[in-house]
């Protein structure tokens, strides 16, 4: 691996903890205990607002990756963007391989950050830019564009941070990304991924960390609440839908309303 852990040094700890993002249980736990990255593949899995995107974005920033998505900010001809609140104080412990990569030329850094909020525009803006992909993704569907980006940017060992990459992917293309992540991890890459996808989280050999009101905890794929709920829903959708959808004959009798 390139990064062995993430932590907030004592000297950088915020004085006021009653404000975002430190009110998020997972971030509060990161502040107290840090986060150890034990394997080549790490998935942070949790609901909206659980802090997974906040944490992976700060990890990307800590490795010198563009917080808007991509490689290094200098490749776009602009200065480094202002870091996020967590990114300002988060520090990474790197292995010798990670330290060597960080100390090398920016153009030689083998790393990439896919940020969910900017991913669609990024795929179009960076096509043809040296160091990125040559294909014109504006002529592709979002899913095809994402697949092109992953296949180009994640072909060699490096440090890859992904924020909800499944957002534009079908079931089939999610499986393709699983295969790609598994392959590059076996070749020496490290991937840290925030996801809602039970498909991606099932990638063999991954370390799965579940985020929620409890903070962060390691778990297995079968025990993820995400997986439990998807199984129940696919077995019998009515278990969930009957609590969400209004029922009653008055909704169906008068077709003129």
What are these regions (language model features)?
Residues 1-32:
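N-terminal pre-Walker A segment at the start of P-loop NTPase domains
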Residues 29-39, 153-155, 183:
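Phosphate-binding P-loop
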Residues 40-74:
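Phosphate-binding glycine-rich loops of NTP-binding sites
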Residues 65-99:
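Flexible phosphate/Mg2+-sensing switch loops adjacent to catalytic phosphate-binding sites
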Residues 110, 156-159, 185-192:
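Loop/turn-to-beta-strand initiation segments
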Residues 140-164, 172-184:
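GG-anchored amphipathic helix commonly corresponding to the ABC/SMC/Rad50 NBD signature/C-loop
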Residues 172-190, 197-257:
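C-terminal lobe/lid and adjacent interdomain/linker elements of RecA-like ASCE P-loop ATPase modules
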């Amino acid at each position: 691996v390139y990064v062995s852990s993430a932590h907030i040094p004592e000297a950088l700890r915020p004085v006021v903890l009653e404000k975002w993002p430190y009110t998020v249980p997972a971030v509060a736990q990161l502040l107290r205990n840090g986060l150890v990255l034990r394997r080549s593949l790490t998935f942070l899995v949790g609901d909206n607002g659980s802090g997974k995107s906040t944490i992976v974005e700060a990890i990307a920033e800590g490795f010198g990756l563009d917080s808007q998505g991509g490689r290094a900010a200098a490749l776009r001809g602009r200065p480094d963007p202002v870091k996020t609140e967590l990114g300002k104080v988060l520090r990474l412990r790197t292995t010798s391989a990670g330290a060597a990569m960080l100390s090398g030329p920016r153009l030689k850094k083998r790393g990439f950050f896919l940020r969910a909020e900017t991913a669609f525009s990024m795929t179009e803006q960076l096509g043809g830019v040296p160091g990125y992909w040559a294909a014109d993704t504006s002529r592709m569907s979002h899913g095809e564009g994402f697949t092109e980006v992953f296949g180009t940017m994640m072909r060699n060992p490096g440090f890859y941070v992904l924020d909800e990459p499944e957002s534009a992917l079908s079931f089939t293309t999610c499986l393709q990304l699983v295969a790609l992540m598994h392959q590059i991890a076996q070749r020496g890459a490290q991937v840290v991924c925030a996801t809602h996808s039970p498909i991606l989280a099932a990638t063999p050999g991954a370390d799965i960390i579940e985020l929620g009101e409890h903070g962060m905890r390691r778990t297995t794929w079968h025990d993820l609440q995400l997986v439990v709920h998807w199984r129940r829903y696919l077995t019998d959708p009515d278990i969930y839908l009957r609590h969400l959808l209004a029922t009653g004959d008055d909704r169906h009798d008068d077709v003129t309303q």
